Amino acid sequence: MATMKDIARIAKVSTSTVSHVINNSRFVSDEIRDKVMHVVKELNYTPSALARSLKVKETKTIGLLVTATNNPFFTEVVSGVEQYCHQHHYNLILSNTEGDTERLRHNLQTLIQKQVDGLLLMCSDARIQIGKDLNVNLPFVVMDWWPTEEKADKIYENSEYGGYLATKQLIEKGHQHIAIITGNLKKSLAQNRLDGYKKALKEANIPLREDCIIESHFDFEGGKRGMEKVLALQPRPTAVFACSDSIAFGAYQTVWHQGLHIPQDISIIGYDNITLAEYMSPPLTTINQPKAELGKLAVETLLQRIKNPTAKHRTLLLEPQLVWRESVRQLYQEKRG
């Protein structure tokens, strides 16, 4: 493991200069700072746990890494996290990775340099281990499906059950030709919801149509493009499970552009229950993710980890619930052809 002495030797500066650059504790010229930080990156250096423990006091600051802050779901979760940080007299530094691994690495280093007391992670598309691959010795909590992370506190939403619940509700309303618009299936979150969809169809003895599985992205544009493919299917599905409310909103626009109506021509159920869902026309039936509970549990779990870093790691599972509105119509049961 690299040390400050190693960095100083390679950068040809003093150890104290390296310390000032890393801790941002004194003015250092841009030329020397760039040279030191280049070596820091090359050696994948992060301050050791021992060095951090020698701080006089905590900074009362938490770092939050998210995949995308322009997604309404993440925005609402971040708001909840900030609220609970404030209640515990902690500051929050938000960092957006945009799904870029190099940006994730860079932003992590920035947060470490700011001496945050711990990290909250919402980067489900990451394929690296924070503790192992990036040599991070900070307390951290994973707030979503981060499949490669083993030794961490984790708070998951039961996505497979949520996908099952959404599909089952459509089936109970008489729908048998049901399409699904997923996010990127390389993400565990998207795959889990698809697994729930398949489980509900199998349980109801409804044949799986592979052409009804539309892989897209968890955003408005993904919903628009995904719904265009759904409406081109023959026979056309009577209902769609949109794997996020953002996907559902994009799907709404495509339906409107094609002169169709929800739910008369096609039913839609979303996932997340973001604030805008109830203001759509018609109001969106969706699966509620307990966003406030997620934010509260994440902050409380991280603060416990900061106080007791050697405690056994915990995994908490939150259960989604159906929120019934007006975007799904009741169909008469029909024999499948």
From Swiss-Prot:
Signal peptide: none annotated. One of its GO terms (molecular function) is DNA-binding transcription factor activity. Residues 1-56 form the HTH lacI-type domain. The keyword Transmembrane does not apply. It comes from the Bacteria. Pfam families: LacI (PF00356), Peripla_BP_3 (PF13377). Residues 4-23 bind DNA. PROSITE patterns: HTH_LACI_1 (PS00356), HTH_LACI_2 (PS50932). SMART domains: HTH_LACI (SM00354). Keywords: DNA-binding, Repressor, Transcription, Transcription regulation. InterPro entries: HTH_LacI, LacI/GalR-like_sensor, Lambda_DNA-bd_dom_sf, Peripla_BP_I. Transcriptional repressor for the ribose rbsDACBK operon. This is Ribose operon repressor. It comes from Pasteurella multocida (strain Pm70). The gene is rbsR.
